[in-house]
């Protein structure tokens, strides 16, 4: 008869009464039983936010080490840029993050405008509209991470409410574009279509309704003790390790370092709106969760300021974009040069370097995504964690798979 037995530690077996009676000799060999186990996790798992393979060394239920293997979504997109015409390249760049494509697309546009020496000539109306897209992308991305976390550990009613709030944020993001997953309103030199007061008023109503829903969600989430209990003390990293891994964004600010490119190196028209920077000291998943909640409300404050500015600018605006060579056709060469733009995406610093050799396609494109550095630090975040907390910790990092596997 097959006997099933389990053990708590090297010297303690958990046996049924019949096993205790029939197999006393097992105690003599208990010191030979293994206490460590290598568990393979991924690359495809229903609870993982993106394809990722983890080789985890477990001691009982605790993670001792975790080796990360990426590349399951590899696109070779940086090499593919070398055959994409300049005018199509910003839209092509959105494949790196199709969930919130505005930062990557506008970062590419900014680098290209620097090569063309038109980055300081962009009309203020167009710059403010670009900021509106970036802040709506930040709101949707953070709400998406919050909903995925709440869906794992919160009561059913709160899960439904967070899903409804997320759908409102998606509608807000979609309303500033002509489709859900691309951004056809922007172009090199400005934006493509004029903006009307009637549209601004409708967008303002949608933003106000979403802001109220987010405020209620934040209050409900902070009052739910179960969420705080599960997230507090897991996935901890100190500021020294965070800096050594190159981590930026909410994960770095959760360690107490208030670094944000919107304030330290403002681009477009951010210097007019002075975004609020939130920090925490504990560096755990709960700290990252609270920072996202606070940044959503701060983004809504910026959105309201931009709306009021747009209503004034529409009356006096003569240009929504400056004339440039890309308006005359698709196949145009760009002067030789190399420029880099830095954007504060929802997860941290996004840097895009473009090299032109004077032809009609890029010579070289190099993209620094924050998710890649967060994924590289997964082993540090998981060290000494409980096996039940692995998915929650990875979710708290806000990693986008396609940003990792470029």
Q: What role is predicted for each listed range?
A:
Residues 2-406:
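Active-site bordering "gate/hinge" segments
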